[in-house]
Curated annotation (Swiss-Prot):
Cofactors that this protein relies on: Zn(2+)
Protein name per UniProt: Transcriptional repressor NrdR
Keyword annotations of the record: ATP-binding, DNA-binding, Metal-binding, Nucleotide-binding, Repressor, Transcription, Transcription regulation, Zinc, Zinc-finger
Domain ATP-cone: 49-141
Encoding gene, per UniProt annotation: nrdR
Species this chain originates from: Treponema denticola (strain ATCC 35405 / DSM 14222 / CIP 103919 / JCM 8153 / KCTC 15104)
HAMAP family per the UniProt record, alphabetical: NrdR
InterPro entries: ATP-cone_dom (IPR005144), NrdR-like_N (IPR055173), RNR_NrdR-like (IPR003796)
Amino acid sequence: MRCPHCGNCDDKVMESRTLAQGDCIRRRRECLACGYRFTSYEHIEEKPFMVIKKDGRREPFDRKKLEKGIERALEKRPVSLNSIENIVTEIEDQAVLNSGLNKEIETTVLGEMVLSHLYSIDKVAYIRFASVYKQFSNLDEFVNEVKKVRK
């Protein structure tokens, strides 16, 4: 690896550690030319999984899009940004597991995952998300969903 201090490509690894959940390796290195010590990180480069839209189109999973939808549902609710980040990470992890070998998941499955998480955290956010996700077209559908939540 190229030394950030002198640019030489000869170094030795002083120490290696596995980080996170085993998907990252931290290495302490020493340049053999100038003695400068630096840290490098190795990550597995994973292919993103695809989301199958209702009309059959496929597009890469977009974590920011999921996060924005959940934030919108939880807007002005007593839920921290850290909690939202954790929800998004949990849903993303579930989606990766559910996508299988072909690395594809339907939006309906993702939507149900979001509804499940929101239901356990904040019922108002659940109703907000459900009204958009389930495309309520009249007040009766909205009221019926509220009645289900109250049970």
